[in-house]
Amino acid sequence: MGKIIGIDLGTTNSCVSVMEGNEAVVIPNAEGKRTTPSIIAFVEGGEIKVGDPAKRQAVTNPTKTIASIKRFMGHTFAETQDEAKRVPYSVVKGDNNTPRVDIDGRLYTAQELSAMTLQKMKKTAEDYLGQTVTEAVITVPAYFNDAQRQATKEAGEIAGLKVMRIINEPTAAALAYGLDKKGNDQKIAVYDLGGGTFDISVLELGDGVFEVLSTNGDTHLGGDDFDQVIIDWLADEFKTEEGIDLRLDPMSLQRLKEAAEKAKIELSSSAETEINLPYVTATASGPKHLVKKLSRAKFEQLSDTLVKRSMEPVAKALKDAGLSTSDIDEVILVGGSTRMPRIADEVEKFFGKKASKGVNPDEVVAIGAAIQGGVLSGDVKDVLLLDVTPLSLGIETMGGVLTKLIESNTTIPTKKSQVFSTAADSQPSVEIHVLQGERAMAADNKTIGRFHLDGIPPAPRGVPQIEVTFDIDANGIIKVSATDKGTGKSHDIRIEASSGLTAEEIEKMKKDAEANADADRIAKERAEKLNEADSTIFQTESQLKELGDKLTDDQKTAIEYALTELRMAHQSQDLDAIQKGLDNVNAAWKTATEAMYAQGGDQGQQAAPQQEQSGDNVEDVEFEEVK
């Protein structure tokens, strides 16, 4: 079995790790960084950039630079309207009511775009390990529903990875934190505030068992939202002063986004920061500049409601676990957004204790995923992970009520059955409407699938017995079956959300992703060949100046002719012609240098007799070394 890598697929940044012996190692990317921005850019010539190269060109290419795509995963188009208004790229309605990103008329799903980041992580691991990687453990926010988990698994498949396990981010963090603390029984709370999502999980650790007691969260709360309050403040201030809304121009909006993120980070260590955006826009009267000072106090005032929003799920998770704050032994802060001082202060105030600073908030989730990969491959022994389903599961019954079969915070894997009946006389079929959520009425919860059980024999209402069974695997992915107990007729499906992809679509996207990888490889080879030609032209010109007087006219002419051909090929960017030009230049130089050395050899032979003659007078003598 090959290595199973662990990937933290984040809203803002992603990270990859692998077990090396008894330790999980975070793998640096090609740019030498331990985390990679979850950003994809489509540039001229069809090239796709991922990570830091994509982030660097975002300001000049805002409508084709995709960030925070995780916030669209597993959602319908209608559910993402607010998110779509906050990004500079175009989000349109696609097949199956899915949100798609429009790039020059080609519509990309969130899964396809996330797969590009996963491919980068896969390649990073392969370069480090020196072998092909095909298996991975991928993390998701604990509060992701079934559709979002399915979408993450699909992204992995498109990237060419077999997803061995979907693991919750706070659980992964706890695994990384507690692996070396097997002897101590303790209860921990993991507060995980990332770029786009928030989770809180309460776990019990002891003797290698990691048991999740409860989880809660908000999949629409993260660092992006803290950036947004700064963006809105800057835009509103500028609009008041200049009468221009910078949010309406994609390039200005992208500059605001970058400035807001930078200001937020600076305010974690400084009391005040200056935001300076020269030439942010222009009017008939000339260019306009934005210069504002933002204090930490003002930022905390702007983001106060967001901080309070995060504390509501914390209280709920603690209540669901049946614990009080005094029962919690350790509080762990995970996710880059927890570096904001106000967050740490609020969490410490709630729990009445200092938060642990023993983990790197950007890397701990990927490390935990790698450890889980080690557990699955047998490299890590004596570790048992017991996770829970974050949301209740049930079906719609008469009157539009949600009847729950599996309550939230039930340990997974799990299976539960319940018998239902028909609502009308001689009803020939039943529709099983599967939902996820905590509200009493079906309409207020998330639909994750529908299917029909047909062929029910005519009978009065309430007589047929329809057994509905929910089966949740260790990934938190749901399978539902319905059986008519009278006829034995059954129907079962692995839930494919209405916003999901078909197997055919996934296969097509997988092939497209492979083609993109080939295109990237070709683009890289092209760039390398052009660089080689450029370097050869420069070196040849330098050597001609330096060694020109030692070459014959014919040798010089041959090299200059080959060099002219190579220059022309380089200008036309014809790779075949460039290779031919390189071969010709090298061949011309080889002929010239061989002649030079041959000539030098003849001179050496003529000098040899003199050396022999002078050697006749050499005598051996003894000498004493003076120390």
Swiss-Prot record:
Q: Which GO terms describe its molecular function?
A: ATP binding; ATP-dependent protein folding chaperone; unfolded protein binding
Q: Where is the composition biased (Low complexity)?
A: 596-615
Q: Which residues form a coiled coil?
A: none
**Highest taxon of the lineage:** Bacteria
Q: Which Pfam families match?
A: HSP70
InterPro entries hit by this protein:
ATPase_NBD (IPR043129), Chaperone_DnaK (IPR012725), Heat_shock_70_CS (IPR018181), HSP70_C_sf (IPR029048), HSP70_peptide-bd_sf (IPR029047), Hsp_70_fam (IPR013126)
Query: Would I find Chaperone among this entry's keywords?
Result: yes
Q: Where is this region: Disordered?
A: 596-627
Tell what triggers its expression. Answer: By stress conditions e.g. heat shock.
Keyword tags: ATP-binding, Chaperone, Nucleotide-binding, Phosphoprotein, Stress response
Keyword Metal-binding belongs to the record: no
Task: State where composition is biased (Acidic residues).
Answer: 617-627
Instruction: Locate the Phosphothreonine modifications and list their residues.
Output: T197
Role according to the record: Acts as a chaperone.
Q: Which family does it belong to?
A: Belongs to the heat shock protein 70 family.
Q: What is this protein called?
A: Chaperone protein DnaK
The species this protein was found in: Flavobacterium johnsoniae (strain ATCC 17061 / DSM 2064 / JCM 8514 / BCRC 14874 / CCUG 350202 / NBRC 14942 / NCIMB 11054 / UW101)
